[in-house]
């Protein structure tokens, strides 16, 4: 486990794309940085939930694979040597003279001039597929870390939201067959995404639930669906993707005395929270007109870091100049 630094200028809570860019930008502004995250590797939801999916709304990239975006952000930040405290929680927050003290588990703490919360949706737990409990981890998954593992397989995707359709779209080129099953007649996914998957000829079975998964020690062989009117349908399946969404909460951050709004943190135009020296950016930050995008998070990270630079050193300039003039 990485040694915990005794003191840094900025502690970033959350190692998703926004947190990684904040780590880079804080280094660019001359700050020492530590990044704490409960997950075992950087990337946040992108790494944990959709490393193989293509992302289409990051500036400068017509498309970019999730894991490739994370790798690029880690490389960008590496030039300033941020300290990664992975597999740890940011627990108790307390004020000390000239800064903040954050407990990071294992009876260890980090003293920081400021804290930037980039925790995304917080700690997330996938919603279970009841009929799949006995198969979880051996044929039934919530997220796909490697698409190639499903090459030549019959895959059943369960869900009706964007995530389910994203997985169907990603699996289509590699799997032998992909079938999407949803328990309702209407989908929550974006209409354009539904049309794209339907246009590929992927069967979309609605008003259906997974009744049973059958197989052997090698894994699933087939999925039995319960349809309307007490009908049944059996699909071949060597893999099932349960894309049913997830539950999330902010964990210990909820006890930090910040002004919260539906599991997000209220911020002002400088990205400062209701507590001095504590800032927030990315999906976890809330303000009027907020749009939750990775691209938005990058801008919020820069806004937060520049204002933190001035908060820590009143003689610093809010605007650091254009990076293109500093080569």
UniProtKB/Swiss-Prot annotation:
Disulfide bonding pattern of the chain: none
Cofactor section: FAD
UniProtKB keywords: FAD, Flavoprotein, NADP, Oxidoreductase
Pfam families membership: Pyr_redox_2 (PF07992)
NADP recorded as keyword: yes
Catalytic activity: 2 reduced [2Fe-2S]-[ferredoxin] + NADP(+) + H(+) = 2 oxidized [2Fe-2S]-[ferredoxin] + NADPH
EC number(s) recorded for this UniProt protein: 1.18.1.2
Quaternary state and interactors: Homodimer.
Protein name: Ferredoxin--NADP reductase
């Amino acid at each position: 486990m990485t040694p915990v630094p005794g003191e840094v200028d900025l502690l970033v809570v959350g190692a998703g794309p926004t947190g990684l860019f904040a780590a880079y930008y804080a280094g660019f502004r001359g700050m020492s940085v530590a990044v704490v995250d409960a997950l075992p590797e950087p990337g946040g939801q992108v790494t944990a939930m959709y490393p193989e999916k293509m992302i289409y709304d990051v500036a400068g990239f017509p498309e970019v694979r999730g894991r490739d975006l994370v790798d690029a952000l880690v490389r960008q930040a590496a030039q300033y040597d941020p300290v990664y405290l992975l597999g740890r929680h940011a627990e108790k927050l307390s004020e000390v003279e000239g800064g903040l003290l954050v407990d990071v588990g294992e009876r260890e703490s980090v003293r920081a001039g400021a804290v930037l919360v980039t925790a995304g949706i917080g700690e997330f737990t996938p919603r279970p597929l009841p009929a799949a409990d006995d198969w979880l981890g051996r044929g039934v998954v919530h997220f796909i870390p490697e698409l190639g593992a499903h090459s030549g397989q019959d895959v059943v995707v369960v869900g009706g939201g964007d995530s389910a359709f994203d997985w169907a779209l990603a699996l289509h080129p590699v799997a032998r067959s992909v079938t999407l099953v949803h328990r309702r007649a209407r989908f929550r996914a974006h209409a354009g995404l539904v049309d794209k998957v339907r246009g590929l000829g992927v069967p979309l079975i609605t008003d259906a639930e997974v009744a049973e998964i059958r197989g052997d020690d090698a894994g699933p062989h087939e999925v039995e669906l319960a349809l309307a009117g007490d009908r049944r349908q059996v699909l071949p399946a060597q893999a099932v993707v349960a894309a049913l969404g997830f539950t999330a909460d902010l964990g210990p951050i909820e006890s930090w005395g910040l002004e919260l709004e539906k599991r997000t943190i209220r911020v002002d135009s400088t990205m400062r929270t209701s507590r001095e020296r504590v800032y927030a950016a990315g999906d976890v930050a809330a303000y009027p007109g907020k749009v939750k995008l990775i691209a938005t998070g990058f801008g919020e990270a820069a806004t937060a870091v520049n204002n933190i630079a001035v908060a820590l050193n009143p003689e610093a300039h809010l605007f650091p100049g254009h990076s293109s003039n500093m080569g």
